[in-house]
Amino acid sequence: LTRLAAHRPIRRQPLAGDPDVRSWAWNAQILFEAGEPAAANEILRRAELYPCEFMPMIQTQILAKYQDRLDADVAEKAETYVRDMLPRAASERIHPSMYNDNFGNMALYVLLVAGSRFGLPEYADLGRIRLEELCDQFRRCGTVMEYGSPTYSPINLYVLAEIANHAPDAEIREKALRCEERLWVEAVTHYHAESGRMAGPYSRAYYIDTVGHAHLAVQRGAELVAQVGEEGGLR
């Protein structure tokens, strides 16, 4: 972890009142897509990194998608952080059948994509094992623990789609697509057209989801489901 000292030290946990740097990094991706790499790099340069389940995937995505637009110091910061977080992604406590399976799926993305990118077969191979465990979860149960969740179903869909986009070989991409398709079936069967969102019962939800105010993730997922319905197919 000391390798990040030239940038910002990794804290064990954010402090109360700290900004949500996950949102900073998500916004940076939007800026890259909008053709504003200078602003995106400055956000990433200032974002303080700490151990969590979301940021390792976000930083891996940024390296996979925007490497040619990253300033050298920002790229080094991201790579160092992801390398340091790989053991966390490989922890036995993080796996496809855990209750917070969005954590397991984000770790799966990091293992597969970062492990391959950095030439670390011990992590890439573990990612393959974990992906097969996820496939087995679908074969045995038909869905994941966070089924029908207005917050986490869209996150799980997004992660699996990104594995299919950035995975190093065709077999991994095909397995990820099959898992993604099964989750789309889950989303469609919970979609309530009149309200434009997923309907209960929810496996995991927040108060905001129960009083008629959709999460941003819900809105994103509902819009995609609506498009799928109009086009008449899952893909």
Where are these predicted regions, by residue range?
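Generic surface-pattern signal
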Residues: 6-9, 87, 91-94, 136-139, ...
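Aromatic-lined, polymer-binding surfaces characteristic
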Residues: 16-167
